[in-house]
Amino acid sequence: MKMRKVGVLGLGHVGAHVAYSLIIQGIVSELVLVDLKESKVASEVQDLRDAQMYAPHKVEVNPGTYADLGDCDVIVNCIGDITLCASNNRLDEMSFTVAQVKSYVKKVMASGFNGYIVNITNPCDVITDLIWKESGLPKHKVFGTGTGLDTSRLVSKLSLQTGVAHQSISAYMIGEHGASQMA
């Protein structure tokens, strides 16, 4: 297996699940966890180290800083604050996430990072574009999950309602990840 180093920024609900999924699937050789809450990082690192003990592969899990991300192949951006979304509008997080992105992207790029960035943070399309512009990376190196989750939800519901296996359903959500998307 090619050695792959992945950094996960933001260890809330989504970031912690991303890290766990990467550990269990064994598709990374090293995982670096970064969050402003050091106690959260320490807890997640220990939980992930414990969780992989029965997996058929070993992943090195480490706490880190933005400076430790320079040699990552991929960074997954999960920074956000769901408490700002009282109205269930993903745009409510925008001022917080814009400020966070502008702060951390400079630090990450100063570390020599030249890998790929996958953005999950809301509002996904706006933040993905901002990461691309702030990083100076080529367009093909910055991705957003966009309506991927919404597409999964649609296919799941169609499968449950029709009895057709989800693997046999081709359906997509398009548009902005939010109220303006459509099937």
Label for each model-derived stretch:
Residues 11-12:
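Glycine-rich Rossmann-fold phosphate-binding loop(s) that bind the pyrophosphate
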Residues 15-16:
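N-terminal Rossmann-fold NAD(P) dinucleotide-binding loop
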Residues 22:
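Aromatic pocket-lining residues of Rossmann-like dinucleotide-binding sites
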Residues 36-72:
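Conserved N-terminal Rossmann-fold NAD(P) cofactor-binding segment
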Residues 59-114:
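Rossmann-like NAD(P)-binding element
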Residues 90-147, 152-155:
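Rossmann-like NAD(P)(H) cofactor-binding subdomain of soluble oxidoreductases
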Residues 155-183:
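Mobile gating loops/cap/lid regions near enzyme active sites that modulate substrate access
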